[in-house]
């Protein structure tokens, strides 16, 4: 990952991500701890008073695809951990697979049936809305790609994590293709809104 990239960039401060190698379908996950342990935003929430109040999330980002023919999967995640409970709202654009948006559940990835049509050699914009429901279920609400919104409205259970895990992270992942071709993407204006 290279930060502070001025071109291509919408803000003048994008991040460059690259994948390659020799093992087909390998992936690389980049994670930013926003709240809680290791917070990069100065929000350690040491008293554990902020996380319990958060139930809604909007992940919003611009991303540049340099070569869609090599872009197997791009993944966008919101993760929350507290009280031994792990909550992951993982969304992947399975571009060279089923061509749809997939979401992660306990048994693995499932297709939403919503097409993920990437703009090649261009900026794309994604907005993901998710919610922690009152019963502790993870609600995948909507995915908006390049101005087209799809309602997902599917709920799934959380999972168990070590009691020491505490915080909210955002992640971005690139998956390699069948040849593990070198591929580069850029992310700009990434934000997480929560309440």
Predicted regions and their residues:
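Secretory/extracellular carbohydrate-interaction modules
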Residues: 2, 9-102, 194
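Surface-exposed coil/turn segments at beta-strand junctions on protein surfaces, enriched
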Residues: 52-54, 69, 118-121, 161-163, ...
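Short tryptophan-centered beta-strand motifs in secreted/extracellular beta-sheet-rich domains
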Residues: 61, 122-134, 141-143
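Short, aromatic/His-centered strand-loop micro-motif at the edge of beta-sheets
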Residues: 104-127
């Amino acid at each position: 990952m290279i930060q502070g990239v001025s071109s291509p960039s919408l803000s003048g401060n994008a991040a460059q991500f690259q994948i390659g190698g020799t093992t087909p379908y390998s992936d690389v996950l980049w994670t930013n701890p926003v709240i809680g342990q290791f917070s990069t935003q100065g929000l350690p929430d040491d008293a554990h008073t902020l996380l319990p109040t958060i139930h809604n999330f909007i992940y919003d980002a611009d991303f540049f695809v340099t070569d869609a023919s090599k872009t197997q999967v791009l993944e966008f995640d919101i993760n929350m951990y507290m009280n031994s409970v792990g909550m992951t709202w993982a969304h992947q654009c399975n571009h060279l697979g089923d061509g749809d948006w997939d979401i992660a559940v306990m048994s693995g990835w499932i297709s939403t049936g919503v097409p993920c049509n990437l703009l090649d050699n261009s900026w794309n914009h994604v907005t993901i809305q998710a919610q922690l429901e009152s019963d502790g279920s993870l609600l995948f609400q909507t995915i908006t790609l390049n101005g087209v919104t799809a309602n997902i409205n599917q709920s799934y259970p959380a999972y168990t994590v070590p009691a020491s895990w505490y915080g909210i992270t955002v992640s971005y992942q690139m998956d390699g293709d069948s040849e593990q071709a070198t591929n580069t993407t850029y992310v700009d204006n990434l934000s997480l809104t929560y309440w």
